Amino acid sequence: MNILTNAEKRTYGAIVIGSGMAGGWAAKEFCDKGIKTLVLERGRKVTHNEDYPTTLLSPWEMEHRGQLTKQEIDENPTVSKCYAFREDAKHFFVKDAEHPYIQDKPFDWIRGYQTGGKSLLWARQTQRWSQLDFDGPARDGFAVPWPITYKEIDPWYSYVEHFAGISGNKDGLDSLPDGDFLPPMELTCVEKYFQKEMKRLYADRHVIIGRCAHLTEPRDIHIQQGRGTCLGRNLCQRGCPYGGYFSANSSTL
């Protein structure tokens, strides 16, 4: 344990609890504004690139070819529901037996206790809310009305999208607003055919490419973070050595 005895060195303008998606961004904002910031994380340290032990492994290089054993599934009935909880990424997840919790109602709590938290494991889909969503409580007569409007949060969406790097197509849909996008991922030939047929048969139904936090054409702001183009490996949950997707480890921290 490193204990600082100098009062000046252990005095901070801001303390952030947790180093995941929200904590990493909060720390970035404080530091960008010149505030000396301390980030506290309950889990182990995971350094970008250095601590992604399976990122370049092939299935045959893993004992169970990337799959879980029956014992692991039985011992982790909750976390094993997550698509990314497999042999190649299980070290980034909290195991059920090690951190049990009380469920008054069914709730699958998927957790990751390490630097970066679940920003290493998220599915990276980043659709904006629209005014339709913000109007939901008033329109449908439930819950508490939102104290903000889409118009107010729109520039903040753009601020985050520009820094994080969100790819997507500008589809002009009121229900799914466009943003500050990098070029979109390309649809497969099957998806393009499906899109064409849906447009022919159902003019009011739109098939679009998802807006996701993957760098298709990195801008200077992403290159300055040390990040590169997404290679489409579909192994993101292992940690990306290229920084192709947004995480606290590859970006904000």
Go through the PLM ranges and name each one:
Residues 52-68:
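Acidic, Ser/Thr-rich peripheral helices and adjacent loops at domain boundaries
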Residues 1-11:
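A short, basic/flexible loop-to-alpha-helix module at the beginning of a structural domain
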Residues 22, 44-45, 120, 126-127:
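Short, glycine-/Ser/Thr-/acidic-enriched flexible segments
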Residues 31-53:
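Glycine-rich FAD pyrophosphate-binding loop
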Residues 63-70, 75-93, 98-108, 113-114, ...:
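Conserved redox-cofactor binding core of oxidoreductases
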